[in-house]
């Protein structure tokens, strides 16, 4: 009987310790709820623990995050992704941009396809759905990107076209923030990118491909008006968030302030953004920025690093829950 009591006491102590740790882990995210958009009548915001992380440990939480994305294993040349460029230190997830020596091929062996490396952290779970997603981030002071977005893998569907049954593939991407700390390439025909490090850059992409055809990118246009941030994205930490309201509506926020709404294309379906996604936290090179970082540009590790203070996710539940 005494052994049974001891076992029960030990179990109770373990459960109490676990509960206290769990409560502490998400207490900041819970406190942050007051800063979210007002919940619809009859609902309240609660923390979605699967995609919430304060990055206060000594290493990346492998139960929540892949240090190198299994969904997108190689970046856009000339930069690839390296797990060793990802770390957690002093309360931040850090992705450092580096020079590869020697340069690499697609297989990671010596080659000439990649000469730079960034990072691509991805959530382990891929069921992020309607809700609020936000990060507090400071971009690197480089011509490589600092980003926070959601996406999913293509699904196949058969349709009738021209009296024949053909296969189609579709996937979605929800870009909450894509920015760079420095802009060096300015296209006179596309001057919008001149102030890209000062703009709140968000998009929704509906990728679509028919059997025998090419994949097309259907990007929803948000507005002809550029939405500016308070200062350049590499100057300080700011929050970047979105409320994925439903299959047709996404609202975007900067430092808790509403910026704009994007309506994904309904060219192929009435409910384009109805599928769950995973989260991506990525630094990469863009094809339109021709002046990518040099070894000299990346000598300063602090300037070469994108810092993510936290990632927080929330979902709506009926108030009676």
UniProtKB/Swiss-Prot annotation:
MF (Gene Ontology): beta-agarase activity
UniProt entry tagged with the keyword Transmembrane: no
EC number(s) given by UniProt: 3.2.1.178
Annotated keywords: Glycosidase, Hydrolase, Signal
Signal peptide location: 1-20
UniProt-listed InterPro entries: Beta_agarase, ConA-like_dom_sf, GH16
Annotated GH16 domain residues: 31-319
UniProt enzyme class: hydrolase
Annotated catalysed reactions: Hydrolysis of beta-D-galactopyranose-(1->4)-alpha-L-galactopyranose-6-sulfate linkages in porphyran
Record: residues binding substrate: 72, 76, 173, 178, 284
Ranges in coiled-coil conformation: none
Active site: 173 (nucleophile), 178 (proton donor)
Keyword Signal: yes
Biological process annotations from GO: carbohydrate metabolic process
Record family assignment: Belongs to the glycosyl hydrolase 16 family.
Comment field (misc): Gut bacteria supply the human body with energy from dietary polysaccharides through glycosidases that are absent in the human genome. Beta-porphyranases, which are active on sulfated polysaccharides from marine red algae of the genus Porphyra, are present in marine bacteria. They are absent from metagenome data of gut bacteria, except from the genome of the gut bacterium B.plebeius isolated from Japanese individuals.
Function: Cleaves the sulfated polysaccharide porphyran at the (1->4) linkages between beta-D-galactopyranose and alpha-L-galactopyranose-6-sulfate, forming mostly the disaccharide alpha-L-galactopyranose-6-sulfate-(1->3)-beta-D-galactose. Some longer oligosaccharides of even number of residues are also observed. Inactive on the non-sulfated agarose portion of the porphyran backbone.
Record's protein name: Beta-porphyranase B
């Amino acid at each position: 009987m005494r052994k049974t009591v001891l076992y029960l006491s030990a179990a109770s102590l373990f459960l109490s310790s676990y509960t206290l740790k769990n409560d502490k882990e998400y207490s900041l995210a819970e406190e942050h709820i007051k800063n979210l958009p007002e919940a619809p009548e009859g609902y309240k915001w609660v923390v979605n623990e699967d995609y919430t992380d304060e990055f206060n440990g000594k290493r990346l939480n492998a139960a929540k995050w892949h240090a190198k994305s299994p969904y997108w294993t190689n970046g856009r040349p000339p930069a690839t992704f390296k797990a060793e460029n990802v770390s957690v230190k002093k309360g931040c997830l850090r992705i450092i941009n580096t020079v590869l020596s020697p340069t690499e091929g697609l297989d990671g062996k010596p080659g000439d396809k990649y000469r730079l490396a960034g990072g691509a952290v991805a959530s382990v779970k891929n069921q992020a759905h309607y809700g609020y997603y936000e990060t507090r981030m400071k971009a690197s002071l480089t011509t490589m990107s600092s980003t926070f977005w959601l996406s999913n893998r293509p699904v196949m569907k058969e349709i009738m076209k021209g009296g024949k049954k053909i296969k189609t593939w579709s996937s979605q991407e929800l870009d909450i923030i894509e920015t760079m700390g420095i802009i060096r390439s300015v296209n006179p025909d596309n001057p919008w990118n001149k102030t890209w490090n000062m703009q709140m850059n968000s998009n929704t992409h509906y990728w679509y491909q028919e059997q025998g055809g090419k994949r097309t990118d259907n990007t929803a246009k948000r507005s002809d008006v550029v939405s500016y941030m308070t200062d350049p994205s590499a100057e300080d930490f700011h929050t970047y968030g979105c409320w994925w309201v439903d299959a047709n509506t996404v609202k975007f926020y900067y430092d808790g302030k509403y910026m704009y709404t994007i309506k994904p294309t309904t060219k192929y379906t009435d409910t384009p953004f109805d599928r769950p996604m995973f989260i991506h936290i990525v630094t990469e090179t863009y094809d339109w920025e021709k002046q990518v970082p040099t070894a000299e540009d990346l000598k300063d590790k602090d300037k070469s690093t994108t810092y993510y203070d936290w990632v927080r996710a929330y979902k709506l539940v009926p108030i009676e829950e």
